[in-house]
Regions:
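Glycine/charge-rich, flexible interdomain linkers and switch-proximal surface loops
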Residues: 29-41, 75-92
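Compact, glycine-rich, soluble single-domain proteins
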Residues: 55-72, 87
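Long, contiguous binding/interaction regions
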Residues: 1-37, 51-58, 65, 79, ...
Length: 139
C-alpha cells in the first residue's frame, strides 16, 4: 500500500485511523492534541481512556495492528506489562491509552498546555479542530 505523501492529508488520515482503532475496542474520552507548536518530538498526541489495564493493552494492540495494516510505521510501545498507561509511538503521533485514575493523575491535557484558553489559541491559529464522530474532544 502506498500512502499519500501530502503531509496534511497523511497526518489527517493517520489521526483518523488511530481514533477508529481506539473506538473499535471501545476506548473512550478521546482527545486529539496538536502539539506541533509545543514540541519537535511529535505532531499530535492522542489520549484515550480504557476501563481496565486489560482493555488498555487491547486498545494499544489494535492501534498497532490497524496502523501497520495501513502501512504506517510503529516506532515502539511502552507500558504493556502494567497496562495502566500504554504508549504507542507512531513518530508523527504519540498515543496514550490510560485507565481513568492514571489519566486523571497525570492529566496530560493540562501538562501539555491544552487548557481551555490554550485550546482556543491553537484552534484559532490552526483552524477549528475537527472531531471524527462528535464525541472526540479536540484539544
Amino acid at each position: 500500500m502506498t500512502l499519500d505523501l501530502d503531509p496534511s492529508s497523511y497526518l489527517e488520515n493517520m489521526k483518523l485511523a488511530v481514533v477508529d482503532a481506539i473506538e473499535d475496542i471501545k476506548g473512550f474520552d478521546i482527545s486529539v492534541m496538536d502539539v506541533r507548536k509545543l514540541t519537535s518530538m511529535t505532531n499530535y498526541m492522542i489520549v484515550a481512556s480504557a476501563n481496565s489495564s486489560r482493555q488498555a493493552k487491547a486498545v494499544a494492540d489494535n492501534v498497532r495492528e490497524k496502523l501497520k495494516e495501513k502501512g504506517y510505521a510503529i516506532r515502539g510501545t511502552e507500558g504493556e506489562k502494567e497496562g495502566e498507561w500504554v504508549l504507542v509511538d507512531l513518530d508523527d503521533i504519540v498515543v496514550h491509552i490510560m485507565v481513568p485514575t492514571t489519566r486523571a493523575y497525570y492529566n496530560l491535557e493540562q501538562l501539555w498546555g491544552a487548557t481551555e484558553g490554550r485550546r482556543s489559541a491553537i484552534q484559532s491559529e490552526n483552524g477549528e479542530a475537527e472531531s471524527r464522530r462528535g464525541h472526540i474532544k479536540p484539544e
